[in-house]
Regions:
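Short, low-complexity, intrinsically disordered N-terminal peptides in bacterial proteins
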Residues: 1-2, 269
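Active-site helix-to-loop segments that bind/position phosphate- or nucleotide-bearing substrates
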Residues: 2-108
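Internal, well-folded beta-alpha domain core
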Residues: 104-269
Length: 269
C-alpha cells in the first residue's frame, strides 16, 4: 500500500463550496481537546501567551484570535449538516493555500486524480493530526512544533504519540510511505511506524554542495506539490515509479539510496 504524507500550509482559505467534503478527520475528539487548550491559555494567561505560542506578529495576532474564536469542533459526521459549522468548512486540500498546494493545483484535477489523492494522500496537522484531502477542516493556527502542553503531554509530538503512524500505516499493512513532509511534521509520524512499514523520503535540490543537495524552502515546497500532482496524474501505486518524475527536476541516482530519492533542478544538470 502506497501512502504519501505532506505538511499543511500556514495560509488557509475560508470555506470552498465548489467541492464537497467527504467526512470528518479521524481524530475529532483530540482536535476538540487541543482547541480547548488554546482557549484555556487565552483565558488563564492572556493573548500574549498565545502570540508567543503561535509566533505571530502583533498584526497577525488579531486575525489568529478571531480564527480561534470562530472555530467550532466537529465531533461526528452529522455535524457537517449544521449550517453554523458548515459555513466554515471546506475540504482540507482546498483549504490550505501555500506554495505547495498552489503547485499541486487540485482544483483543476479530474475526478480520477482527485480519487487517487483521497486514497493515497495524508496531510499532517498540528491541530487535526492527519487528514485526507477531502476531510472537512476549518481555518486554524497551530503548527506541529508549537510548545503546547496538554494534559500529561509536554508538546504536540507527545500528545499525538503513535496515533498518526497507526492511522496512516497500520501494523501489518506493509505500507510504503512517500515522505514529502518537512522535518517538523515528518517526525510526528516516522519514528512511530510499525516494523513492516518502509519510508522513502524525496529531497529536491537546486544544486550540489559538498556532495549534498542544496535545498531551498520555497523551491522544495513547489516541487513537493508538483510531485503529488504528478503522482495523481500517473495514478502511482509503486514507489519505484518515482524516479521517473520529471516536472522541473530529474532523479539523481548518485546521491540517492533505497530510503532517500534526490531530485535536482534540471537547470543545474
Amino acid at each position: 500500500m502506497l501512502q504519501v504524507v505532506i505538511s499543511p500550509a500556514k495560509q488557509m482559505r475560508a470555506a470552498q463550496d465548489a467541492f464537497e467534503v467527504l467526512g470528518i478527520p479521524p481524530f475529532a475528539r483530540e482536535t476538540a481537546r487541543l482547541h480547548r487548550a488554546l482557549l484555556d491559555i487565552e483565558r488563564n494567561e492572556g493573548s500574549d501567551s498565545l502570540q508567543a505560542l503561535w509566533n505571530v506578529s502583533d498584526k497577525l495576532l488579531g486575525p489568529c484570535l478571531n480564527t480561534l474564536h470562530e472555530f467550532g469542533p466537529i465531533l461526528k459526521n452529522g455535524d457537517l449538516d449544521n449550517p453554523a459549522l458548515a459555513c466554515h468548512l471546506s475540504p482540507a486540500v482546498m483549504s490550505y493555500h501555500g506554495i505547495q498546494y498552489q503547485s499541486m493545483a487540485p482544483e483543476v484535477m479530474d475526478s480520477a486524480q482527485l480519487a487517487w489523492l483521497q486514497s493515497h494522500l495524508w496531510i499532517l496537522s498540528g491541530l487535526y493530526g492527519c487528514v485526507r484531502p477531502f476531510h472537512a477542516v476549518e481555518p486554524y493556527r497551530l503548527e506541529m512544533g508549537a510548545k503546547l502542553a496538554v494534559d500529561d503531554a509536554p508538546d504536540l509530538y507527545a500528545f499525538w504519540s503513535d496515533k498518526l503512524a497507526r492511522a496512516i500505516a497500520p501494523a501489518g499493512s506493509n505500507t510504503t510511505i512517500v515522505n514529502l513532509a518537512s522535518v517538523e511534521y515528518a517526525k510526528a509520524v516516522l519514528p512511530h511506524l510499525a516494523g513492516d512499514a518502509t519510508v522513502v523520503t524525496c529531497l529536491f535540490g537546486e544544486g550540489i554542495r559538498n556532495g549534498k543537495p542544496i535545498q531551498r524552502s520555497t523551491a522544495s515546497k513547489k516541487a513537493r506539490g508538483s510531485m503529488v500532482r504528478w503522482m495523481a496524474e500517473n495514478k502511482l501505486e509503486d514507489v519505484s515509479g518515482l524516479t521517473a518524475f520529471d516536472v522541473g527536476y530529474r532523479h539523481f541516482p548518485e546521491l540517492s539510496n533505497n530510503n532517500t530519492l534526490v531530485f535536482l533542478n534540471e537547470q543545474t544538470l
